């Protein structure tokens, strides 16, 4: 009889322990169900890169003096600078410039140390290609300006991944329909236009007086 009661007691303890573990797992699941989504629906939604984002390098052919500083400061000696010496002007003349983004680590040293500021970082990060040779950009491809996320009518730009409004810490109390943090690009433009109009109106009133 005592053995039977012990078996029943052990079974009850194991059942309670199992139910406890299942309850803990379900509590985490239900907890995440009540939170707001943090997923960006790419490519229909895209984040607006920060001002210091290190994306594809932009190259201005007319500014380059073929000094090859970018090659010397590059950790992997990546930029290919092809030039010839002009005997009349006694200066280097750039013939061809290329960067292989399949190898580039986007450290930004070439941009930082360029004496003529012919290199700059852009916000372009969509560089995927089926052939690795297509990632080798020449001076023509490097000179192309990227298409900004804020100018793409087919994409909803998102300023940040922080969906919570200012001053709210607990995400569980925020409904999924509430406004995201930060202003949208069109709202920023409207705000700038409103400030500009107000300034012009104030200047006109001062002039009339």
Swiss-Prot record:
Binds 2 [4Fe-4S] clusters per subunit. NCBIfam families: ndhI, NuoI, PRK05888.1-3. It is a peripheral membrane protein. InterPro entries: 4Fe4S_Fe-S-bd, 4Fe4S_Fe_S_CS, NADH_quinone_OxRdtase_chainI, NDHI. NDH-1 shuttles electrons from an unknown electron donor, via FMN and iron-sulfur (Fe-S) centers, to quinones in the respiratory and/or the photosynthetic chain. The immediate electron acceptor for the enzyme in this species is believed to be plastoquinone. Couples the redox reaction to proton translocation, and thus conserves the redox energy in a proton gradient. Its cofactor is [4Fe-4S] cluster. It catalyses: a plastoquinone + NADH + (n+1) H(+)(in) = a plastoquinol + NAD(+) + n H(+)(out); a plastoquinone + NADPH + (n+1) H(+)(in) = a plastoquinol + NADP(+) + n H(+)(out). It comes from Trichodesmium erythraeum (strain IMS101). [4Fe-4S] cluster 1 binds at residues 64, 67, 70, 114. Belongs to the complex I 23 kDa subunit family. The keyword Repeat applies. Keywords: 4Fe-4S, Iron, Iron-sulfur, Membrane, Metal-binding, NAD, NADP, Plastoquinone, Quinone, Repeat, Thylakoid, Translocase. Residues 55-84, 95-124 form the 4Fe-4S ferredoxin-type domain. The lineage of its organism: Bacteria, Bacillati, Cyanobacteriota, Cyanophyceae, Oscillatoriophycideae. One of its GO terms (molecular function) is quinone binding. One of its GO terms (cellular component) is plasma membrane-derived thylakoid membrane. It is found in: Cellular thylakoid membrane. This is NAD(P)H-quinone oxidoreductase subunit I. One of its GO terms (biological process) is photosynthesis, light reaction. PANTHER family: NAD(P)H-QUINONE OXIDOREDUCTASE SUBUNIT I, CHLOROPLASTIC. Its EC number is 7.1.1.-. NDH-1 is composed of at least 11 different subunits. [4Fe-4S] cluster 2 binds at residues 74, 104, 107, 110. The keyword NADP applies.
């Amino acid at each position: 009889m005592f053995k039977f009661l012990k078996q029943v007691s052990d079974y009850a303890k194991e059942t309670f322990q199992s139910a406890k573990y299942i309850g803990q797992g379900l509590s985490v699941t239900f907890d995440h169900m009540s939170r707001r989504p943090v997923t960006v629906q790419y490519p229909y939604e895209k984040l607006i890169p920060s001002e210091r984002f290190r994306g594809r390098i932009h190259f201005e052919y007319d500014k380059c003096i073929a000094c090859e500083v970018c090659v010397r400061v590059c950790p992997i000696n990546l930029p290919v600078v092809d030039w010839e010496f002009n005997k009349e002007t006694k200066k280097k003349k750039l013939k061809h410039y290329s960067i292989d983004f399949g190898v580039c680590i986007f450290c930004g040293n070439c941009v930082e140390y360029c004496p003529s500021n012919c290199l700059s970082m852009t916000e372009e990060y969509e560089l995927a290609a089926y052939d690795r040779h297509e990632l080798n950009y020449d001076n023509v491809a490097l000179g192309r300006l990227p298409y900004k996320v804020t100018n793409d009518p087919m994409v909803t730009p998102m300023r940040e991944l922080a969906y919570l409004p200012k001053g709210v810490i607990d995400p569980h109390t925020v409904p999924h329909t509430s406004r995201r943090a930060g202003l949208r690009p069109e709202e920023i433009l409207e705000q700038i236009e409103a400030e500009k109009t107000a300034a012009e109106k104030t200047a006109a009133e001062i002039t009339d007086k």
